Design a protein with these regions (language model features):
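N-terminal secretory targeting modules
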Residues: 1-67, 76-80, 95-101, 129, ...
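Short hydrophobic segments within beta-strands
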Residues: 67-70, 173
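Short loop/turn segments at strand-loop or loop-helix junctions that form parts
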Residues: 69-71, 138-139
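Catalytic nucleophile serine of serine hydrolases
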Residues: 72, 109
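Short, solvent-exposed loop/turn elements at domain surfaces
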Residues: 74-78, 115-116
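Extracytoplasmic small-molecule ligand-binding "clamshell" domains
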Residues: 75, 85, 103-106
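Alpha-helical cap/lid subdomain in secreted, periplasmic
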Residues: 88-104, 113-268
Length: 269
């Protein structure tokens, strides 16, 4: 499987076909010490659908608002500081990719929450912000508490329905691949349920579980390299690598309508 370096160089304008094909800024820019290579296969990064609302704001050069809602993975548990959680890293990555655009990423993560908890605050934490893109991280806490969704994804669909009322793009983010998650028998069904719901509802999915699983299975990274000492949460390196991959996926999906057929054929494995 072809893998790509998730580093990149600034582009004016961004060449969409190059976004997910080895760009040039080394990940070690984030650290004074040697760090593992941040990479992922094309098929794990590429979002299924174009981000049309994000694309419209790019075209009109209007300010772009992104809401990242979720639990501790969004809040930043395991990060050494708020600056190194994934939403703040994502804001940095998108500003490098789109230096002439105003892009704001709002962190609406709350430790320990499940989908029903998030839905209770959707109005004040998502709807009021009038975002162009919603990143919804979900599923992990239900897995580690041995509480598989019994509604067959109805709660997720409820959230997606509410996001549609504000004309925002949405990307679901599935659980992390970490020791305290993968020991749970519910993790496989949860990852599958989120993927199935995303496909049925025609929304995008960032496959965090599979990206992190690849670090372990294919890159042979020790869990300590990308999981915090608690065995559950991500660390500075993995939050930054996740943000880098997600930024490239967002940028490509937001510009996909202008891609040529030739460029598309080279990007799809």
């Amino acid at each position: 499987m072809q893998a790509i370096d998730l580093a990149y160089r600034a582009m004016k304008p961004i060449a969409v076909a190059a976004l997910i094909v080895g760009l040039g800024m080394p990940f070690s820019a984030y650290s004074e010490t040697a760090a593992p290579k941040c990479d992922a296969p094309l098929h794990l990064l590429r979002l299924a659908n174009p981000l049309t609302h994000f694309a419209q704001k790019l075209a009109t050069r209007g300010p772009i608002t992104i809401v990242a809602i979720g639990s501790s993975s969004t809040a930043g548990a395991g990060a050494s500081s708020p600056a190194t959680n994934y939403p703040n890293r994502l804001a940095e990555e998108l500003k490098r990719l789109f230096p002439t655009h105003s892009i704001t990423v709002l962190n609406r993560g709350v430790n320990g929450e499940e989908v029903d908890d998030m839905l209770k605050r959707f109005d004040k934490d998502v709807v009021v912000a009038k975002p162009d893109l919603v990143l919804w991280q979900l599923g992990t806490n239900s897995v580690i508490r041995d509480q598989m969704f019994t509604d067959h994804g109805a709660a997720i669909r409820d959230g997606l329905k509410r996001i549609r009322t504000i004309d925002a793009d949405v990307v679901l983010i599935d659980p992390q691949f970490a020791p305290k998650v993968i020991v749970k028998p519910e993790v496989g069904p949860m990852v599958e349920l989120i993927a199935t719901t995303a496909k049925q509802e025609d929304v995008d999915l960032f496959r965090r579980f599979d990206v992190m699983k690849r670090w372990r299975d294919d890159d042979h990274m020790a869990f300590e390299s990308f999981v915090s000492p608690d065995g559950l949460h991500m660390n500075d390196w993995s939050y930054a690598c996740m943000a880098k991959g997600l930024s490239l996926a967002i940028a490509e999906a937001a510009q996909r309508p202008v891609m040529s057929a030739k460029a598309t054929s080279h990007m799809v494995p």
